[in-house]
């Protein structure tokens, strides 16, 4: 009977690392596309600008947080990013706080 199990070698570890990096790169590309194609000019500029400036340094956890933010409705995001409404505490993830602050700076506020 042949053994179907093989020991992990350094090359398999680096290969797994390469796959993980490829996965992060693909997520970053999708995130950039989604952030720049929201449907309204204002959100494309604010959200797209933030993502373009920050996505390449985001961790996997930060990418997940940003992906979840992009699931939120544009009217809510726009109100928070333009400072028309305060950011509700239950929605205030570290990433969304960064976005609100970035938006405030970009708007010169």
UniProtKB/Swiss-Prot annotation:
Keywords: Chaperone, Cytoplasm. InterPro entries: SDH, SDH_sf. Residues 1-22 are annotated as: Disordered. Its main location: cytoplasm. PANTHER family: PROTEIN EMI5 HOMOLOG, MITOCHONDRIAL, SUCCINATE DEHYDROGENASE ASSEMBLY FACTOR 2, MITOCHONDRIAL. An FAD assembly protein, which accelerates covalent attachment of the cofactor into other proteins. Plays an essential role in the assembly of succinate dehydrogenase (SDH, respiratory complex II), an enzyme complex that is a component of both the tricarboxylic acid cycle and the electron transport chain, and which couples the oxidation of succinate to fumarate with the reduction of ubiquinone (coenzyme Q) to ubiquinol. Required for flavinylation of SdhA, when the SDH operon and this gene are overexpressed in G.oxydans. Flavinylation of SdhA is detected only in the presence of sdhE. This is FAD assembly factor SdhE. The lineage of its organism: Bacteria, Pseudomonadati, Pseudomonadota, Alphaproteobacteria, Acetobacterales.
């Amino acid at each position: 009977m042949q053994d179907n199990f093989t020991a992990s070698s350094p090359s398999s570890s680096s290969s797994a690392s390469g796959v993980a990096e490829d996965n992060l790169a693909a997520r970053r590309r999708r995130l950039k596309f989604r952030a720049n194609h929201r449907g309204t000019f204002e959100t494309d500029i604010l959200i797209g600008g933030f993502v373009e400036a920050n996505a390449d340094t985001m961790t996997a956890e930060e990418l997940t947080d940003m992906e979840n933010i992009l699931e939120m409705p544009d009217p809510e995001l726009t109100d928070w990013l333009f400072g028309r409404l305060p950011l509700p505490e239950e929605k205030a993830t570290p990433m969304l706080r960064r976005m609100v602050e970035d938006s405030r700076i970009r708007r010169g506020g």
